[in-house]
Amino acid sequence: MGIIIAITGGSGVIYGIKLIESLNSLKLETHLVISEWGEKTIKIETNIDIAYVQKLSTKWYDNKNMAAPISSGSFKTDGMVIIPCSMKTLASIANGFDDNLISRAASVCIKENRKLVVVPRETPLSKIHLENMVKLSELGVSILPAMPGFYFHPSTIDDLLFHIVGKVLDQFGIENNMFNRWGVKR
């Protein structure tokens, strides 16, 4: 069925890019949406071309296309990941304000009881941010902050990135060896 991947304008777009690369290498179906600020942040934070990221997905959609298949509950998916998830997008979803394809697809996942994982990338967090996360968590949304572990002695930035990517894959039951798990020697 496939996983929807949304990249928003929060700092840390490389997490989303690494996730889509990983899903592509696993030959899994993906549906990609990048917000306007997600695209701008990719240009600011990386030397990666947007077209490259789009080509990694099975299908990509314009965030303004509210008629895209992923905007309907009748279009079956395995769920959605918003990585990184800006606080604007988080607030939009938490308050049912479906003003673009990303927030609409997330609302569809909630109403259809499909897996929705948000990877917030903000610090510090205000009470409003935390309340929005609690609201989503109470609806069954997985809140997976971009907070990598250090127990496995990461030596590169990729080690830190793949720790989070591996945790996202775990949320969907996708077997992976992206990071060293606690208590497991490699």
Show where each model-derived region lies.
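A cross-family phosphate/adenosyl-ligand binding-site feature
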Residues: 1-117, 123-186
